Structures are given as C-alpha cells and as structure tokens.
Amino acid sequence: MWPLCFLLNKLLRVEERNQGILDGNGDSTFPKYCLFDDPLVSDGKYRDAGLPSSSHMDVPHVHQLASWDCGLACVLMVLRASGIASCTLEDLAEICSTNSIWTVDLAYLLQKFCVEFSYYTITFGANPNYSIEEFYKEQLPEDLVRVDLLFRKAHESGIIIQCRSVSIHEISCLLLSGNYIAIALVDQDKLSKSWLEEVLVSGLHSSNSCYTGHYVVICGYDAVRDEFEIRDPASSKIHERISSKCLENARKSFGTDEDLLLINLENMRNQNGY
C-alpha cells in the first residue's frame, strides 16, 4: 500500500491537468492525465492523510436573477472569491449570449477569466437521450449542435475535459485540502425538502419528481458530520449545509452527467493578490 502522504501529494498535482482529453466513446484522443488517483480514504479518517477534519473556503453568496442563470451566478461566486470583482451577472449573460446554459458554457466563462479549473463529466457532448426529460425537451434539439461544437473546440481553446466520474471521497479530500471549490450540476428535486423550501426564485421548484437541473458551489466539508457546505444561488440562506448522501444523489441523478468543475481557488487568490 502506498504511504498516505504520497497519495495526498498525487491528489494535489493540479498543475499537470492540461495533458488529457477523452472523446465521447471513452477513447483517448490526446495524452490523458487524471487529476485524481483514487485516494484510499475510508471511515472518514482524513487526519491520517494529513488533512483536517473540516475546511471551508470563503465564497461570497450571489443570488441568481432568473430561473436559468444559476450557473452564471455560480461562476460569479467563483470570480468574486478569486478577487475578481469587476464583473456582473449581466456581463456573464452577455458573453454567453444564450439562456440555455450548459456546463461547457460555464467552462468557457472560467477560461475567459483565466480561472484554473478541471472539468469532469461522464458524457462528452450533449446527450440526445435527455429528450425524454421535460427539463431538456424544449431546448435540446437546438442545443445539440451548439453544445457538441463547444465540446469539439474545447481542447484547442485550452479547456481540458476529462470523461470520468468523480467520487464523493475525492471531492471531500480536495475540499479538505483548503485549496479547492467546485461548481456541480445537480438535480434540485433530489435535494433536501427543508432546503428547497428556502428558495427565492419562484417557479424553480415544483412538487413533481421530474429532473430539474441546477448549479451550486461546493465550498467546504465537515468529515465529522459528513456534510458539505454549499452556496445555492436560488436560496435565501447564504450558508447551506447538505449531507454527503443528499449531494451524491442530487449530482448523480439522470440528467446531470455528473458534471463537475473543480477550481483551484488558492492559486487564483495568490495570482490576484487576494
């Protein structure tokens, strides 16, 4: 078995992230580098790996202004946490020029502002199978071509997309390192009921069980409670905590592709003198 300190060092080698991409069939088209080498973490004993039992990053809360701009609000939270204050939701919306926001759109926004991040998904491109979901039905035919083109142009634009699932343990370890936050695509209907009752934006949550795509920022983890701290752009609460099980169910729901943008916030703050 590898020493735990060696595993931790492998976890934090984000600087080498720009060496890989996978196509939609899982075939490697460029030399691949995987940010995570599945950490051997069990029973929440993070102290043994030199990690604290809890950690959170200071991320200012930003409310979304419409039912479709939660992803833009999450990007704005990342920018403000990085020390980039000269930007608004309206600015980001103008750059995107669409109100059908996909994770790849958020990746291009982060790239435009020189944010260091890693992009993970289990599906390369837009999944046509989502046409059966009410959430995607109206926009998907139009989005298929646009989104697929963004994926195809990602590598030449400097965006590395890794086609793999990221475990909840990997996410918790990176958060406990105190250097990272994440933007995650989740199914809002699978989040806790008590949390959803606090949403500000009307019409965002319904009583049915259909998939409702939503973006949140994950900015902390408590290993003792097994809870993640998040920033929800639709919530009236600035600080939210959610159980590991609830987050896992919400982000692995059919429709999310397990999309995850992992941001090295510490490096960004150092670069911006924040």
Swiss-Prot record:
Record EC number: 4.6.1.2
The entry's keywords: cGMP biosynthesis, Lyase
GO biological process, one term: cGMP biosynthetic process
Catalysed conversion reaction: GTP = 3',5'-cyclic GMP + diphosphate
Naturally occurring in which organism (per UniProt): Arabidopsis thaliana (Mouse-ear cress)
Name this protein carries in UniProt: Guanylyl cyclase 1
Database matches in Gene3D superfamilies: Cysteine proteinases
Cofactor: Mg(2+)
Assembly with partners or alone: Functions both as monomer and homooligomer.
Entry function: Magnesium-dependent guanylyl cyclase that catalyzes the formation of guanosine 3',5'-cyclic monophosphate (cGMP) from guanosine 5'-triphosphate (GTP). Can also use ATP as substrate with a low activity.
GO MF annotation list: guanylate cyclase activity
Protein's pathway: Nucleotide metabolism
